[in-house]
Amino acid sequence: MADHLMLAEGYCLLQVPPHTHGPHAPRTLQPYAGPGMDSGLRPRGAPLGPPPPPGTLAYGSFGSPVSFQPFPVSQSPGAGSTHLQSAATPSPGRIPAPPAAAGGPSPLQPAPGAAASLPPPPPPPALGCMDTELIDEEALTSLELELGLHRVRELPELFLGQSEFDCFSDLGSAPAAGSVSC
């Protein structure tokens, strides 16, 4: 769709004919000429004339194109529109407009007619989803010694074999009368 923009920036889209020696034949690469240069021959500026229509390719020195179609010719009924949809996350410093003010469907809801062709999204992971691979106590003990955590007294929850700790004795204060203990 943006081929004319890429060509204006110095990109050249070439359609390469199929190799005669198979897909794994040795290939030579053209040297990189830098941005704005056409293989060292001449500087490339803005293209002359109007931009090419969408779907046209520059064929370079390979002549006419081979019969290769990278996408299907027929379009779905909703594919005729070429407008861009706004992103769900606004740029920094911009205030997002409410969905009703935009006049279109909400960005979280599919366009009419598109829901039938799309598969349902996968379910979101559970809130308590964690990697459940267990680590033996020997590995944790060696990690504790390697990191020097066996010398740390301020973090009692890191000691191995201790499933919970008494927060009031560890913090050095007694609970107030009528308060809920942790």
UniProtKB/Swiss-Prot annotation:
Q: In which tissues is it expressed?
A: Strongly expressed in heart, spleen and testis, and weakly in liver and kidney.
What broad class describes the main subcellular location of this protein?
nucleus
> What compartments host this protein?
Nucleus; Cytoplasm
Q: Which Gene3D superfamilies match?
A: 6.10.140.2200
Spell out the GO cellular component terms annotated for this protein, sorted alphabetically and separated by semicolons.
Answer: cytoplasm; nucleus
| Cited Pfam families | CITED
Q: Where is this region: Disordered?
A: 22-129
Tell me, in a sentence or two, what this protein's role is.
Acts as a transcriptional coactivator for TFAP2/AP-2. Enhances estrogen-dependent transactivation mediated by estrogen receptors. May function as an inhibitor of transactivation by HIF1A by disrupting HIF1A interaction with CREBBP. May be involved in regulation of gene expression during development and differentiation of blood cells, endothelial cells and mammary epithelial cells.
Its name, as the record gives it, is Cbp/p300-interacting transactivator 4
